[in-house]
């Protein structure tokens, strides 16, 4: 029973941190004092559940990694058409960000500017893994469908992910006014026509 309560409190702390990142406070540095006040506990109580604020951010980063990576792997296992795979992976990231605005501040690095470098490195690694997966999907098209792309797969993967990252940055910059999925269908039609 005590272990369950501790898990619930940990989740409560992470949810409070995500909510703070989603609010106007998210554009400023979040201190443990502010977070403790949000949760309704002392700072000491926060540290009973997490040894540092960096570990709290790591908890949110793990959630982001697990959520996105698991779903990408499912898409790649279930879908075989290259263009559908690409569309679904890109749309997944955009929808995840739109549904989790506070976590989008972490994904763009805005919430990590005043935190430990290793946190930003971890987010960078997540996006590098996604880019690698996109590049692999693009390369597999020759094997699966017998045709390639007019542009090098590495360049194309970087451009695809860059478009997504730009949409996430715009979402954060606009204080969550401009949804990342806004106009995605038009963007995808344009891209599909170019890539054929």
From Swiss-Prot:
HTH tetR-type domain span: 7-68
Keyword line: Cell cycle, Cell division, Coiled coil, Cytoplasm, DNA-binding
Pfam families per the UniProt record, alphabetical: SlmA-like_C (PF22276), TetR_N (PF00440)
Gene3D superfamilies: Tetracycline Repressor, domain 2
UniProt cross-references to InterPro entries, sorted A to Z: DNA-bd_HTH_TetR-type_CS (IPR023772), Homeodomain-like_sf (IPR009057), HTH-type_TetR-like_transc_reg (IPR050109), HTH_TetR (IPR001647), NO_SlmA (IPR023769), SlmA-like_C (IPR054580), Tet_transcr_reg_TetR-rel_C_sf (IPR036271)
Coiled coil: 115-142
Subcellular location: Cytoplasm, Nucleoid
MF GO annotations: DNA-binding transcription factor activity; transcription cis-regulatory region binding
Gene Ontology BP annotations: cell division; negative regulation of division septum assembly
Keyword Zinc: no
DNA-binding region: 31-50
SUPFAM superfamilies to which the protein is assigned, alphabetical: Homeodomain-like (SSF46689), Tetracyclin repressor-like, C-terminal domain (SSF48498)
Keyword Cell division: yes
A Gene Ontology cellular-component term: bacterial nucleoid
Protein family per UniProt: Belongs to the nucleoid occlusion factor SlmA family.
Physiological role: Required for nucleoid occlusion (NO) phenomenon, which prevents Z-ring formation and cell division over the nucleoid. Acts as a DNA-associated cell division inhibitor that binds simultaneously chromosomal DNA and FtsZ, and disrupts the assembly of FtsZ polymers. SlmA-DNA-binding sequences (SBS) are dispersed on non-Ter regions of the chromosome, preventing FtsZ polymerization at these regions.
PANTHER family listed in its UniProt record: HTH-TYPE TRANSCRIPTIONAL REGULATOR RUTR (PTHR30055), NUCLEOID OCCLUSION FACTOR SLMA (PTHR30055:SF183)
Complex formation: Homodimer. Interacts with FtsZ.
Protein name: Nucleoid occlusion factor SlmA
Organism name: Photobacterium profundum (strain SS9)
Lineage of producing organism: Bacteria, Pseudomonadati, Pseudomonadota, Gammaproteobacteria, Vibrionales
């Amino acid at each position: 029973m005590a272990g369950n309560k501790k898990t619930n409190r940990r989740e409560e702390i992470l949810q409070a941190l995500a909510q703070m990142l989603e609010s106007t406070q998210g554009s400023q540095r979040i201190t443990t004092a502010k977070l403790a006040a949000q949760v309704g506990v002392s700072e000491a109580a926060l540290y009973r559940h997490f040894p540092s604020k960096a570990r709290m951010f790591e908890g949110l980063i793990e959630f982001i990694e697990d959520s996105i990576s698991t779903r990408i792997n499912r898409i790649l296992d279930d879908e075989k058409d290259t263009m559908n795979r690409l569309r679904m992976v890109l749309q997944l990231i955009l929808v995840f960000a739109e549904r989790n605005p506070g976590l989008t501040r972490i994904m763009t690095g805005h919430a990590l500017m005043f935190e430990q470098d290793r946190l930003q490195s971890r987010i960078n690694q997540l996006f590098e893994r996604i880019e690698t997966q996109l590049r692999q999907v693009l390369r597999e098209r020759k094997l699966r469908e017998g045709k390639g792309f007019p542009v090098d797969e590495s360049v194309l993967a970087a451009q695809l992910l860059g478009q997504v990252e730009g949409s996430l940055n715009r979402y954060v910059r606009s204080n969550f006014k401009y949804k990342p999925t806004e106009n995605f269908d038009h963007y995808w039609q344009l891209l599909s026509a170019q890539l054929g």
